[in-house]
Structures are given as C-alpha cells and as structure tokens.
Amino acid sequence: MGQKVSPNVLRLGIVRDWEDTWYAEKDQYVKWLDQDIKIREGVLKLLKDAAVSKIKIERTNSNITLIIRTARPAIVLGQEGKNVSNIATAVQKIAKDRNLKVEVKVIEVKNPDADRTLVARWIGEQITNRASFRTVQKLAIRKALKAGVKGIKTSVSGRLGGVEMARTEGYIEGSVPLSTLRADIDYALYEAPTTYGQIGVKVWINHGEVIGGQSQRVSEKAPMNNDRRFNNKNNNRGGRK
C-alpha cells in the first residue's frame, strides 16, 4: 500500500538542503535539536505579522546564525534594529547562554505569491475570516501562476463551510510531478482555526527542474489549460492524513 511523504523530506540531499546546518556530538545533538525547535517557535511568535517564510539555523558552540526569509523585512528588523535585539535575547534565553553570539540575517521574499508557506498561510487566514474556501484557492492559484511557477496544487481539509462531515477539496493547475526527484517542489502545511474546528491547508508549488545544480525557479509562466479539481470526502479533521 502506498504511503505519502513530504516532498521537502524526499528531496533532501538531492535538490533540497537541510534547514539546520551544524554538527554536534551524540550527547549534544538532542539538546541542540530541541533548542532549534523552540527557537523557531519563539521567533515566529515574535514575528507573527512579518510574513516569515522560512528560518534557517547555522550554529557552532559559541555562535548561532538565523537566516530569516520574509516578505516584510522592515518588520523583522524593527525600528533601529529593535526587533533584532529582541530576537537575540530570546535565542540566548532559550539556549540558556547569555554569552552566545547571535547573528540575524534577513532575506527578502520578493515574490510572496510564489512562496509555499506564504500562500498556505494566506489561504488559511482568508478561511479563518470566513471567505469561501473555493474562491481563495482559485485566487491563490491564479496569483502563483502569474508569478511564474510551473505548477501549483492546493488542498483544504476539515469541516468546510461548517458542515457536519469533514472532507477534502482542492485544485491543481500546471505540472506538479511529486515523484520526479529533480523537480524543485515546495510543500507547506498551515492549520487555520475556525469556529467549527481546524481547517488544514496544504500547498505544493513546482518551480521547475533542477538541472546541473541550477534551479529554474520562476523562469516561465505555467500553462493555464491544465485545470483539474479533486474532491475526496473523508472523516478526518484538519489537514493531516
């Protein structure tokens, strides 16, 4: 029986790199991994309005570097770098090391309509605000294709429209070859809170194939004539299956 796997994990070491870059001895590995999870949660909480796409962590025994990809770099930096200082203090508190040197690098996401995390979050926020789950998916797909992605697939799961039975509905346009390992496919999951429970939002975005180590991201506009809709009724709540 076939099993589903995250496209991000499946491509690690092939066309995708790890989001944590460091080496630790056996007794220190678990400690650092636990800290990284808490650091991401803490930073995302501090920057909840900054449209953060991804946080990459690089570290040694005495230094830690946070590479934050965001669509709103001004919010991340803050007035006179105030937010950067707050982030550094929060990281030192989590690591329980006041002497830890913390460096924050900010990379601007220039095309948020083609970013998997920001697209999933936008769809989820619109659903939380009682927008039509079908309309927001179609709009997100149109904007992503206009941004130049090769293909995009969206899926929402839960008590859609407040009905009693949970189900899954989604759309796909363009090419999204999940089994092609050289395909540069991004995947994101967002859980949208509503008055009738959690709605799971999944987004897959194909940026093209990675050939010779070179990504073809947002190079050509995906075709508009490949529009397929799927509808899977099930009893699962939320986006996890």
From Swiss-Prot:
Transmembrane segments: none annotated. InterPro entries: KH_dom (IPR004087), KH_dom-like_a/b (IPR015946), KH_dom_type_2 (IPR004044), KH_sf_prok-type (IPR009019), Ribosomal_S3_C_sf (IPR036419), Ribosomal_uS3_bac-typ (IPR005704), Ribosomal_uS3_C (IPR001351), Ribosomal_uS3_CS (IPR018280). The keyword Membrane does not apply. Residues 39-108 form the KH type-2 domain. GO terms for cellular component: cytosolic small ribosomal subunit. CDD domains: KH-II_30S_S3 (cd02412). Part of the 30S ribosomal subunit. Forms a tight complex with proteins S10 and S14. Binds the lower part of the 30S subunit head. Binds mRNA in the 70S ribosome, positioning it for translation. Belongs to the universal ribosomal protein uS3 family. This is Small ribosomal subunit protein uS3. The lineage of its organism: Bacteria, Bacillati, Mycoplasmatota, Mollicutes, Entomoplasmatales.
